[in-house]
Amino acid sequence: MDQRGLIAEYAEKIAELPYSAGPAPRIIFKKDGKIYMTRKGTDFRYISDEDICEVSGKLDQLDTVEAAALMRLKKQKAMILARTPFVGKYIEAGKPIGACLDDMAQIIGRRVPIVHRSVREIQNGLETSSAVLLKGRYAVTCGRTLYEAYTALLVLEKSAKVNVKASVIGGARHIGKLDCRLMRNFYLYRYSKSEKELDDDIEG
């Protein structure tokens, strides 16, 4: 499967979620030094090849801030920009999301920070977490594959939902720093893949 086909596949998955991914979700994918990105405003239910463009030569533009950050990251190859319902509540409040579920500790990390929409802040945030919240905007989830970025999107919304609902009865108990680090490192080690295996996402 080529890059555009892979992006379209995950766009359709996002469109089929039982909740909204926000008014303008986007997908960014890096392959062989090139960056591909869905056009702003694309309806993921009806995505076509024309909705996916290469932006490698346009990384200095306002529209490609996240793509420029992805280009700088060494291991991550995919990003999803979305504002799901419970994550949106944290963005509105300007608060980071802490890990209260093992899934989040393993797949995303201990804490999802709030950052400004700048290449440097996004890059720095994603060096230690698989997600960041852009102040007043949306969440960015990333991964070594689109599957990982998509999984992080699902886990982040699930974690935010648990945190919000638990706040009614005094708040969720967050996982400790050491436990989070151990779970995260185990996940990365256990599910690490060679470059050839990662390329299976492209080759099908």
Located regions from the model:
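Glycine-rich flexible loops
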Residues: M1-G204
